[in-house]
């Protein structure tokens, strides 16, 4: 089934792309959530008009992402946890905890965009990548210290 994407969808395409997907995926997920519309002639003509608006929207979201990256990279994250004598944490620091810290500091970031290969289980300083935008990423400096 051919669809025109209304939102960026990871592993599928960008806004305005015409993609071919399984009918069930289209009927049960993309169409009901408003993430895509059917690729008919009428919608294709509307797409041409919408592409100009989409270009503006992409530029605006890219600028917002760059501003967010500047704020993120200026921020120093210090998390305190109980730790054993060898610096091993009781528990771990996850992307959820980092997202909660950012939210407390006025930056709303989805935890899925914070890329941790595995939870942090030792004291120390870490660089944590964040997927802010498909074209722009940031690196957070996370320091885990003993409580």
Swiss-Prot record:
GO CC terms: ribonucleoprotein complex; ribosome
Annotated keywords: Ribonucleoprotein, Ribosomal protein, RNA-binding, rRNA-binding
Paired cysteines (S-S): none
GO biological process, one term: translation
The UniProt record lists the keyword Cell division: no
InterPro entries listed in its UniProt record: Ribosomal_bL9, Ribosomal_bL9/RNase_H1_N, Ribosomal_bL9_bac/chp, Ribosomal_bL9_C, Ribosomal_bL9_C_sf, Ribosomal_bL9_N, Ribosomal_bL9_N_sf
Gene Ontology MF: a single term: structural constituent of ribosome
Keyword Ribonucleoprotein belongs to the record: yes
Signal peptide interval: none
Highest taxon of the lineage: Bacteria
Any Pfam family matching the protein: Ribosomal_L9_N
PROSITE patterns hit by this protein: RIBOSOMAL_L9 (PS00651)
PANTHER family found in the cross-reference section: 50S RIBOSOMAL PROTEIN L9
Role description: Binds to the 23S rRNA.
Family: Belongs to the bacterial ribosomal protein bL9 family.
Protein's name according to its UniProt entry: Large ribosomal subunit protein bL9
Species the sequence originates in: Trichlorobacter lovleyi (strain ATCC BAA-1151 / DSM 17278 / SZ)
Gene: rplI
